[in-house]
Amino acid sequence: TDKYMHGILNKDWGLLPPKAVLSHLVLMEHPNYPKLLVYGDMAVIPLPEFKQKVAIVKYAAGVCKELGIAQPKIAMIAATEQMLPAMLACTEAAQIAKMSERGQVPGIVDGPLALDVAISPECAKIKKLKSEVAGDADALVFPNIESANVFYKTNTQLMKGVKTAAVVVGAAA
């Protein structure tokens, strides 16, 4: 991975355009989830700033559209689905969800959503959340690299039958 990323980031001959956002997305097939799931960033951006989160949403929507999902449902993951001003993940998720309502980002974006609410219809029902995304997410955007990486490793190391593919997005071809 280090050599691969070094080649992409090389200033003389690399593939990263100026001011571009490079990100890492995973496509996961999970035996306990009814459809493919796209998520990120789990390997490139340690603590995405707001503009980087918007870029990750756009990249995730693009991957979903390539998979034939015309209006991908994208969950902005946080520790809670409550709008807590003290938690940056919550406030930025709410802002990006509002951008989605206005057509400023692709897909149907909702957040903040706790992970259980994003992927479990039962949890969404118990918590009485009215959302097109809750319980039916096509993509998850995590607030930081730690949470995305733990999600990836928990699923790939503790679950049998999980299949993944990863891609670095944002580079020029």
PLM features: residue spans?
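Anion-binding alpha/beta catalytic cores of soluble intermediary-metabolism enzymes, centered on
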Residues: 1-133, 138-143, 147-173
